[in-house]
Curated annotation (Swiss-Prot):
The keyword Transmembrane helix applies. It is found in: Cell membrane. Belongs to the major facilitator superfamily. This is MFS transporter fsa7. Efflux pump that might be required for efficient secretion of fusarisetin A or other secondary metabolies produced by the fusarisetin A gene cluster. Keywords: Cell membrane, Glycoprotein, Membrane, Transmembrane, Transmembrane helix. CDD domains: MFS_Tpo1_MDR_like. One of its GO terms (cellular component) is plasma membrane. Glycans are attached at N64, N106, N252. The keyword Glycoprotein applies. It is a multi-pass membrane protein.
Amino acid sequence: MATKDPAVTTPDDSQLEAGRGNTGNNAGDALEKPSSSTGTMVDEPADPNVVDWDGPDDPEHPLNWSKTQKNLHLVIVSLFTLAANLAATMFAPGAEELATEFSITNSTVTAMTVSLYVLGFALGPLLLAPLSELYGRLIVYYGCNFVYIAFTIGCAFSTNVAMFLVFRIICGCAASGPMSIGGGTVADLFPQEERGKAMALFTVGPLLGPVIGPIIGGFVSENVGWRWTFRIILIFSGLIGVATVIFMRETNYTVLLQRKAQRARKETGNDKLVPKLTRNETPKQMLVRAIVRPLKLLIFSPIVLLVSLYTGILFGLIFLLFTTFPSVFQDVYGFSPGTAGLAYLGLGIGMILGLVLFSVLSDKMLKQKSGAARPEDRLILMKWLGPVTPLGLFIYGWTAKYAVHWIVPIIGTFVVGFGSLFVVIPGQIYLVDSFGAEAAASAMAANLLVRSPFGAFLDLTASPLYESLGLGWGNSVLGFICLLFTPVPWFFYTYGERMRTHFKVDL
């Protein structure tokens, strides 16, 4: 058994620590690995009224499910996040068409048709992540998909801008569910040494969705109108919803043990049976505590705050960069609107290459570490490859300013995509490994709470930024901002374990 990380403390720590060595692993290991029911690993006899897993090989424990079953869950959750993020930017090329149809003359209102959806990514997790940790992941997936489909239909058939904006932010809140609790599902299903590749696939949606979206949306809006962008998302989300109902099962350990205890009480007639790690709290107290968890992590954990700020800056810069593509590739290089959309492929290909490299190296490097792996070991690739992002911004900005051959600024965006992947994915895995299955959803919710407003509002600064400084210095400013955060993984790689010990967060 691995040691519970001091970054998370619960009233049951004394139970969790019994019989464990001091291996210094993550907070979720106490729940991730089924404990033996033989009593050979504990100093005191097990309470006969406490329902636990039936040993480390209990087939009901998600870590012991078949590889096919685990991967199927991972693919469905990853498709959820892809659909959510496609919708963030897929509509963007049709925003001007909507503005014309609804007689919108204010450019800020037009921008809000995109940014309000991303703002929903920050608001939804405050409720959805806690609900998943109290009542299970599956019911949240079901509910979010139902609401998302219903209000996507509303967007497709909106008759005025007020209706559209309200439906749009509700869609964003619903779409945030899989994004905030997906990390918890990954932590439920995969042990730490297999989590890198799994999290890489899960993060494909938030990274590639905004890149692919405008390419698809540009051709759809140009040929069949902006409303069809929502109909396509509706069809995609509906198919994912059907797959969820057919193939997915509950993975939350606490909920599974509660159900197991409920079955045991019914079968034995012993009403004293309780699941392991039960808290003596009312449902209202548990819900309030769970809702506060993401905020407590942001306030009291420097790790969560700084990693979330770093990933948020990168997320916002990518959205801001998108706003420059039409003017750069249409006005400077003379591309047609449809062809200009292909300029997004530079970012996308850079991310795909980074994703492949990360998937190959991350878990392999972790397994090669002598002794117990630390969550901080996830930051090695972030330390060395994250700093290439500002280099890409410098290349893109200055070559576009001087109209160097169009392939060179696209190479710059390729470098941005490659480098940003090595910030966002390691950052998220670091949070999941640090807090484990017990609090992964809350850690991801805290990350989204910081990250999403950057994506929603940073692009609104594009016009004043580039009008004042131009493409060269404008993108250089963004590059220098990225450089300011490059010491973050170096600092946490050296001092992260000490900080998790010092800054304990009572969840």
